[in-house]
Amino acid sequence: MISNRLAVLVCVAMAMMVGGSALCAAQSEGFFASWEDRVRDTLAQQPSWPIPLVTASSGLLQVARTDFVRQIAPARTDTWNYGNTKGVNVVPWYKIEFDVLVPPYIQHNSKAEDGFGDFSMLLKYRLAAGNEAHGNYSLSFSLAGTLPTGSYKNGSLDATISPTLCGGKGFGRLDVQSTLGAILPAGDTAKLGRVVVWNTATQYHLGKFFWPEIENNATFYHGGANDGRVQDFVTPGLMLSKFKLERDPRNRLALVVGGGMQIATTHFHSYNHGLVLTARMLF
């Protein structure tokens, strides 16, 4: 059984690894210039697809991101999620991404108490990649850790660890990205159960900025109150990517926006529809 202590250690280890690397690098000259060159070279070796609306990217990212989600439940109550556990992603080392994910604020519009969700961090390693001229694919593995910092039951009862495998392949203007992962609680496993999450996104590049997409977001419950159940959503969406904010071709500063609607396709679902709006600043 995974312990609470292990989940905390995963989060602390992530922070120490990245912080230690940054501290050592900062002691040398040209820290920021070296960082920029490393990020530029690293990202140039993978496809330039935009991050899907819900599915995690199969490549590495250096981005600040926030999402806004409105979930409409079968009882016709709606819940707003401000932030949706997004934050800042950086590439501190070659082939490695580190994310600090800000707790979302949950507004229920019901008798449930509003409040903040859990704090999370994520470490991703890119296993293999080729840009559009060299295979047009990417493959990575990530490990996320979540701490139960939520207020008024707006987070998990215990810390969790989430290993995920992410892959993507491009075919001209079309790309398909898919992730398969699990959410493993550190305690109260009989009550919370274990969850397997499988997301797949298909995107098509139209014109200069338009990326229409269709996603499938599936969740499989093992143990807990929803043992044996499956929840699935089909999510049509549109990403607008990317609007460069500087003329310098070496400058990566750019804006990406998008939106879509999750539509429940299974008999069991915690909400009928989910409006998802997103804004990302690449840097």
Located regions from the model:
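Transmembrane beta-barrel domains of Gram-negative outer membranes and organellar outer membranes
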Residues: C24-F283
